[in-house]
């Protein structure tokens, strides 16, 4: 089954509402919580979310600067991993992609038993990580980007689980939601990342139900 990740903003007015949104997303069945690129410190935000959730995975962004200070990064990862009871996933940004940064992130992550996903990774060596994020702007482009990585993993006999995440806009309705999930899953995606939206909770809970159009029937007599 396709996993669903929800991308939360990194800015908010009321911390109580923000944490309540995170709990609601977990209750609705989402696999993971992701964060926008700009705003408050992501590690502090995820630490707060970790204390009020119990199942959902917490995706922490890792930058080139983070990898340049491995001791500090290790301390942050150890803290968040302990608070979340092992629910942390690391994403390495596009600017940090490359053999050395990826190897450093993987070594650090293995010590804390967490996965590493590469963002916007087009290099087949991305197959050495645990997954990739943000490939392509359509199911067709997604498939074209994933296939070389899949062939690399097959050639290198890398048989472990590998996650392929696509980022989409908030669907307009349930029919679009069903169609996008089907198309991306057929293209090789294992997960979709969707921006937080009040309508998303209903899609997560009832996305496979037919929309009630009885009001149209009544209006038409």
Where are the model-predicted features located?
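Active-site-adjacent structural elements that line small-molecule/cofactor binding pockets in enzymes
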Residues: 1-221
């Amino acid at each position: 089954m396709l996993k669903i990740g929800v991308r939360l903003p990194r800015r908010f007015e009321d911390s109580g509402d923000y944490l309540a949104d995170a709990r609601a997303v977990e209750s609705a069945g989402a696999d993971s919580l992701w964060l926008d690129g700009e705003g408050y410190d992501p590690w502090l935000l995820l630490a707060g979310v970790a204390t009020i959730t119990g199942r959902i995975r917490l995706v922490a962004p890792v930058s080139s600067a983070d990898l340049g200070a491995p001791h500090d990064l290790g301390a942050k990862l150890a803290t968040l991993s302990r608070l979340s009871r092992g629910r942390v996933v690391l994403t390495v940004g596009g600017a940090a992609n490359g053999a050395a940064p990826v190897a450093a992130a993987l070594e650090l992550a293995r010590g804390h038993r967490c996965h590493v996903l590469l963002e916007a990774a087009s290099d087949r060596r991305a197959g050495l990580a645990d997954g990739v994020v943000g490939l392509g702007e359509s199911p067709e482009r997604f498939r074209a980007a994933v296939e070389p990585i899949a062939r690399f993993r097959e050639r290198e006999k890398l048989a472990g689980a590998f996650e392929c995440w696509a980022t989409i806009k908030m669907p307009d309705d349930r029919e679009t939601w069903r169609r996008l999930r089907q198309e991306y899953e057929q293209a090789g995606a294992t997960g979709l990342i969707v921006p937080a939206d009040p309508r998303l909770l209903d899609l997560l809970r009832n996305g496979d139900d037919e929309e009630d159009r009885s009001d149209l029937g009544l209006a038409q007599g």
